[in-house]
Amino acid sequence: MAGKARVHELAKELGVTSKEVLARLSEQGEFVKSASSTVEAPVARRLRESFGGGKSAPAKGSDTGAAKGVAKAPQKVSGASPAAKAPDRSLDAALDKAVGNGAPAPVPAPAPAPTPAPAPAQPADSGVAPPAATPAAPAASAAPAPPKAPLPGQRPAPTPGKPAAPQAPHPGMAPGARPGPVPKQGVRTPRVGNNPFSSAQPVDRPIPRPQAPRPGAPRPGAPRPGGASSGNMPPRPGGASGGPRPPRTGAPRPGGGRPGGPGGGRSDGGGGNYRGGGGGVGAAPGGGFRGRPGGGGGGGRPGQRGGAAGAFGRPGGAPRRGRKSKRAKRAEYENMQAPVVGGVRLPHGNGETIRLARGASLSDFADKINANPAALVQALFNLGEMVTATQSVGDETLELLGSEMNYNVQVVSPEDEDRELLESFDLTYGEDSGDESELQTRPPVVTVMGHVDHGKTRLLDTIRKANVREGEAGGITQHIGAYQVSVDHDGTERLITFIDTPGHEAFTAMRARGAKATDIAILVVAADDGVMPQTVEAINHAQAADVPIVVAVNKIDKEGADPAKIRGQLTEYGLVAEDFGGDTMFVDISAKQGTNIEALEEAVLLTADAALDLRANPDMEAQGVAIEAHLDRGRGPVATVLVQRGTLRVGDSVVAGDAYGRVRRMVDEHGEDVEEALPSRPVQVIGFTSVPGAGDNFLVVDEDRIARQIADRRSARKRNALAARSRKRISLEDLDSALKETSQLNLILKGDNAGTVEALEEALMGIEVDDEVALRVIDRGVGGITETNVNLASASDAIIIGFNVRAEGKATELANREGVEIRYYSVIYQAIDEIEKALRGMLKPIYEEVELGRAEIRALFRSSKVGLIAGCMISSGVVRRNAKARLLRDNIVVVENLSIRSLRREKDDVTEVREGFECGMTLGYSDLKEGDFIESYELVQKDRS
């Protein structure tokens, strides 16, 4: 504790008991609890003064006596002035004035070098203590040199604590100044040391002695003059260590002399092993406690004023610059070698491959290469790409950024990522387990494809002996239907699974899913219509999936049917009939009349037996594909799945895409419950926690926990991919146009099936109207319109599109109250047409200027009611009231965008005046002259198609 002392230490120092000290403190108005309590330095000083300077005990040993003699030498020197023993009130006043009021004290002239003879006394009211006398050893020891007498006005230094060993003196010894260089002219007022309770003033540094040995060695055990000074006592120059260092020249030493040491320089500034003292004349005050960084460079340039840094342990001064470690040098070298991308230094790769998922962010990329995401963001910004650290980034941007840093960025496809995900759970998809002996024959899966209204569903109705077509809105198929029928082939009952796909152009994804999940494709072509666009698309899907095609030429019973023409047209697309020497089977049928249906079934079975190896392992865990899914109000999420391998049973834990659950019930196409589904069997599965996506692969896992983890990871991947796809890239060049006001139509899509919603969204997003309007689907889902959808639409100004669904509960009432528009559709192309019209209606109108007529100003009249009236003659065309006008003077436009406020013919208000008539009009403009022309026009909105 700097400046503080305990009561028992003071009692021991003064030679009295602790009770006497406590009593004396109580008389002085100081409340002290016990002998172990501490008192402040001013209180200790007044206590010593009240005891008459203290009663010092004689030295009991050589070592201890030497230490005490150093501290109390000014009191024992013979011939000292009596003023040295009495309290110096003038010195206290000078100290209070210097510390409290900040007034500079007068600077004495530099003192000469100290000599063994006593120094002449100076006036006590000078305000600055002269250089401290060199302490002498006690009388019991042989002093090496005669001691100096204390100067007049010098106060005895307090020693609050018991002196320690000679090598580590007590921190309470009297402050002083070390010898230093002679101060230059213009020296500033020395500042008080860091101890605000000290009664001593900083002194001028005496001129250092020449380096020479003192006559007489110091007593053994005494403090070494050349070592660390005792507290703030000024050390003797020279000594056993070979004399003091020569005074430094040049810039002052910043901070503490040694790391962790107190303030001051090593040998030419104030400070010691404990509390730092004044660093000499003009030096910054040392300070701080031991172990803390001190401030104030000792031995600084004379006249330099120290700061408060370093006082009371506060860090001060500049840090010492050390050598760089090898690691720091290597990091600096690597930073210099790093590539600069967009003005930012980034890590330099060695050509290694970085695998990133589609829709990854810059944070994901930075984690892979151990870089700072902020640096990647800044680099892309300087390259003209504005992306945040957590925003999904496109594949091209990631690859470009990686190539600049010498990394080979590979964006993992969704299929590869899903395969890696399943492999992490020791699962595989798409392969039959077991050997060849475990494989059994399965029924063929046949997909019926073709153009809209060519009779696909009627053909399936004829085969199934049902009427599905009448139940479809608009007479067109808008879902994928899966059925399994039994046919008689050569006296043997065979099963065939049929999948019906939509033929409308909006259902491209459905047809693609049907082609991937099938073994054989039946291409239905109307004999009276020929090959149409969706026919060509169906051919492309089947050929891309490497699926054999059987062509069914339908409607041969209608007028104008020409099956030969169909065969010729399909030849252009690689489908050559067997009649023409090809390998594609053609069957002429009539689905309405039921003609040649058995021949078509036989052609399908022959193709399956001849070209395909239709076998699967029924004993493994089931795998397949979800062809369709919807949300049933009473049963919850329902998925139509096609088992491709294995056997699906009630109670199995399944995962399909980002949906999972346990099979609670299975229903076939006739609505009957099924306990198990063998390969190639389509069933409706009830028990999913959410609606699976159409076309998602499903598989059976061991437990629900694994299914949930797989579904959660797929859901996160789906969100990232969707965010990357929907994010509109904005470059700095396009920033101006991006900031312009654009109209956006927000939609919420709800449908009865997942595939229908997907097809509707893709069709709507394909509408191209203009860059000024944009279409955004903010939410999509399967099932009825709920209050949550209405609240979201109200918050985002969206329109709700319901496809084959209605509003549930109080959703309609809430929509009416919130002003949310709900549109219901049952035919997909009606929804597409109306949304396209709505987008066109949101376009900003384009106005075209149509000139009406010109009028010449013949006279001007002023009216106190209406202002300036122009008497005009209509020279051409017609002038209408409230029409736009511009003023022409010498065929130069004077002012634009005027309005004809009033129009009169004689005394009657009129709406228009034709050519050859006079009239009076007001324009709300006063700078009119005779001879000016008024040109009238109107803006007509132009239709934007």
From Swiss-Prot:
Give the classification, highest ranks. Answer: Bacteria, Bacillati, Actinomycetota, Actinomycetes, Mycobacteriales
Comp. bias intervals (Basic residues): 320-329
Give the species. Mycobacterium ulcerans (strain Agy99)
Record keywords, A-Z: Cytoplasm, GTP-binding, Initiation factor, Nucleotide-binding, Protein biosynthesis
From the UniProt entry, list the residue stretches annotated as the region G4. Answer: 554-557
Biased composition regions of type Pro residues, renumbered to the chain: 105-121, 144-169, 208-223
Cellular localization per UniProt: Cytoplasm
- Major location category of this protein: cytoplasm
Q: What is this protein called?
A: Translation initiation factor IF-2
Task: Please give the residue ranges the record annotates as the region G5.
Answer: 590-592
Q: What domain of life does the UniProt record list for this protein's source?
A: Bacteria
Q: Where is the tr-type G domain?
A: 441-612
Q: Where is this region: G2?
A: 475-479
Q: GO MF terms on file?
A: GTP binding; GTPase activity; translation initiation factor activity
Q: List the disulfide bonds.
A: none
| Protein's UniProt keywords contain Nucleotide-binding | yes
A Pfam family this chain is assigned to: GTP_EFTU
What HAMAP family does the annotation carry?
A: IF_2_B (MF_00100_B)
Residue ranges, annotated region (G1)? 450-457
List, as start-end ranges, the regions of compositional bias called Low complexity. 129-143
Ranges of Gly residues composition bias in the record: 253-316
Q: Which GO terms describe its cellular component?
A: cytosol
Please give the function described in this protein's UniProt entry: One of the essential components for the initiation of protein synthesis. Protects formylmethionyl-tRNA from spontaneous hydrolysis and promotes its binding to the 30S ribosomal subunits. Also involved in the hydrolysis of GTP during the formation of the 70S ribosomal complex.
- Residues of the region (G3) are 500-503
